[in-house]
From Swiss-Prot:
Active-site residues, as the UniProt record annotates them: 132
Cofactor(s) listed in the protein's UniProt record: FMN
Subunit structure: Heterotetramer of 2 PyrK and 2 PyrD type B subunits.
Protein name: Dihydroorotate dehydrogenase B (NAD(+)), catalytic subunit
Length: 305
């Protein structure tokens, strides 16, 4: 039997395999290039980008938990100007599609970032982080209100011709309602889930461990929730879904594809093993070969319910 075909397509972009690196866990790609074969990865998703540099939250801002980790990094990043000057030159040398994750605090910030990124040919697509407060409307998080989510996706859609992926927050009552709002605003794909809000407490000090008090929970602990949400959303929308949440092995990734994901993102696993994304792709290939499956696309949405 020939080697299985691992290629998939997201919004017109062909990926050599379905495994992407999740934003915030792989820097801007260059940081991992000495340790990882970037061409073993389907796509690189950069650390979240904002208009101005962001210092992030005070420490401590990471804590291990049972089956995962909490992070309160605070979206620390270099800002769009330094990204263009210092990060893009390296991206020109990479043969793997680069997707830039970005965020804002107003519709205008989202639109301006989309316009700036639209001018960079090395950027294959954008991923919008909508888990941010809208400072002009009482601080409500864009990603927890369908109307706000629609507005921000629409603003980005009108500002760029690049494919637009929207990263959905799981901290909502109805993830499908959020997915519909983003699809109606002409998103090209949806990625989910972002982290779940959690906290950790130091019993002896009687204080939160994280300086920010709360943080985002990721890792294997969130996988069952992520699988359920991916399954719900994939059945509800006609655009591709990218699965995220506790993917540590090729088996995990293929489970997300059965639930309806066209591709997956690997996040927390990168902290444990910088080569996790490439390893997971290889494990997927091995499973397909061992089970006589010629094309990974046969797995997408093949869950029997």
């Amino acid at each position: 039997m020939q080697k299985p075909d691992l290629s998939v397509e997201i919004a017109g972009i062909t990926l050599r395999n379905p495994v992407m690196t999740a934003s915030g866990t792989f820097g801007y790609g260059e940081e991992f290039s000495e340790y990882v074969n970037l061409e073993a990865i389907g796509a690189i998703i950069t650390k979240g980008l904002s208009l101005k540099p962001k210092a992030g939250n005070p420490t401590p801002r990471i804590v291990e938990t049972t089956g995962g980790m909490l992070n309160a990094i605070g979206l620390q990043n270099v800002g769009i100007d330094a990204f263009v000057e210092k990060k893009v030159p390296f991206l020109r040398t990479v043969a793997t599609p680069v997707i830039v994750n970005f965020f804002g605090n107003t519709l205008e910030e989202y639109a301006e970032l989309a316009e700036r990124l639209d001018l960079i040919p090395e950027v294959a697509a954008v991923e919008i982080n909508i888990s941010c407060p809208n400072v002009k409307h009482g601080g409500i998080v864009f990603g927890t209100d369908p109307k706000a989510a629609y507005s921000v996706v629409k603003a980005v859609r009108e500002a760029t011709i690049k494919p637009v992926i929207v990263k959905l927050s799981p901290n909502v009552t109805d993830i499908v309602e959020m997915a519909w709002a983003c699809a109606d605003a002409e998103a090209d794909a949806l990625s989910l889930i972002n982290t779940l809000t959690g906290m950790a407490i130091d019993l002896d000090k009687r204080r939160p461990i994280l300086a920010n008090v709360t943080g985002g929970l990721s890792g294997p602990a969130v996988k069952p929730i992520a699988l359920r949400m991916v399954w719900q959303v994939a059945r509800a929308v006609k655009i591709p879904v990218i699965g995220i949440g506790g993917i540590m092995t090729g088996i995990d990734a293929l489970e997300f594809m059965l639930a309806g994901a066209t591709a997956v993102q690997v996040g927390t696993a990168n902290f444990l093993d910088p080569g996790a994304a490439g390893r997971i792709a290889a494990e997927m290939e091995r499973y397909l070969a061992d089970n006589g499956i010629a094309d990974v696309k046969e797995m997408i949405g093949a869950l029997e319910v």
